[in-house]
Regions:
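Accessory DNA-engaging acidic/polar modules
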Residues: 1-109
Length: 109
């Protein structure tokens, strides 16, 4: 399993109506709980009713310096690029990728 940086939020899934994140750090756990996320196994999840609610929740996660998981297809990094291309999200965000389980790279887009 990949090492997650201390005191971070890693967004693992944002394609459907449920957002799935992994959170390290008690302060951030409290903040995302306030946003409505609940524990589900090793993740925290939150369901949204529509695309507008999802975009607003993504904005809140970006304010908390969340890292969007890099990958191809409908990984969070690609979904964010799609939202930017369509004008649904403006602004910067960060993606995280791993070259090996304990070595990660963070990039701002």
């Amino acid at each position: 399993m990949n090492t997650i940086p201390e005191n971070t939020i890693v967004v693992s899934y944002i394609t459907g109506d449920t957002l799935k994140i992994r959170v390290q750090g008690e302060d951030l756990i409290n903040k995302v709980t306030y946003l409505g996320f609940v524990h589900s196994c090793s993740f925290m999840t939150k369901m949204v009713e529509n695309e507008g609610d999802k975009i607003e929740l993504i904005r809140e996660l970006v304010k908390l310096d969340a890292l969007f998981l890099f990958g191809y297809g409908w990984y969070p990094s690609e979904v964010m690029a799609f939202y930017k291309e369509k004008g649904l999200y403006t602004g910067k965000y960060k993606i995280i990728s791993w070259s090996e389980p304990s070595h990660y790279q963070i990039e701002e887009k």
